[in-house]
Amino acid sequence: SVSFPSVQREESNDKDLYDVHDILTKLYMHYLLNSDEGTVARKYLEKRNVFTESIKLFQIGYAPGKDLALNYLKSLGYELELLDKAGIVTKSESGIYRDTFRDRLIFPIHDALGRVIAFSGRTLNDRSPKYLNSKETPLFHKTKILYNFHRARQEIKQTGTVVLFEGYMDCIAAHAAGVSNGIATMGTSFTQEHLSVIGKNIKEIKLCFDGDAAGLKATSI
């Protein structure tokens, strides 16, 4: 059995969406690092040279193949309507709510202030799609978000240089190797909105995308 980390629920309704993302980030990471079910995910990360230090820094987690988020957040008093609005649960055709992320490695997505606003889940088997992102919510607009920007923004501002990766894992590995101005798109498209997020005083953007058709399409924007 796994003992869950204690959390304090804030009373402000305005913060509920942020709260549930913050709570789940801690829960998913705790599950990755401490549960037997997280073993496969831990071994996958080890093969990609992502170890405990990076896991904690990037708050990587694991969502097991059960309704962990739904049951845990309901036990804290959060309503289904809020969880649906946050994209944490999904309503099935039969009308039953289930966890959106099941048996997936979890990458929290932060806004520019470092608040978790969404998740991206990577499958650890042959399930499709390979990556599953949170739906668009009042907090999360995919075309305006760059992975790791909240952490890299100071270095980007100081150097005027951005290293743009296609994937989260590449960005995480590069950070461990000393690249502190690396960010990643959530997929393969880099938009004008992304460019406006980075800022006006950028001297150079280094593209480190995959050399396949999807990656080449992204660099042509």
Language-model regions, residue ranges each:
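Non-catalytic accessory segments of DNA primases and related replication-initiation nucleases
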Residues: 1-81, 85
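Phosphate-handling DNA/RNA-contact segment within nucleic-acid enzymes
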Residues: 9-24, 66-205, 218-219
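Conserved beta-strand edge residues that scaffold enzyme active sites
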Residues: 59, 188-189, 212
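Short beta-alpha connecting loops at secondary-structure transitions
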Residues: 206-210
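Phosphate/diphosphate-binding loops
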Residues: 211-221
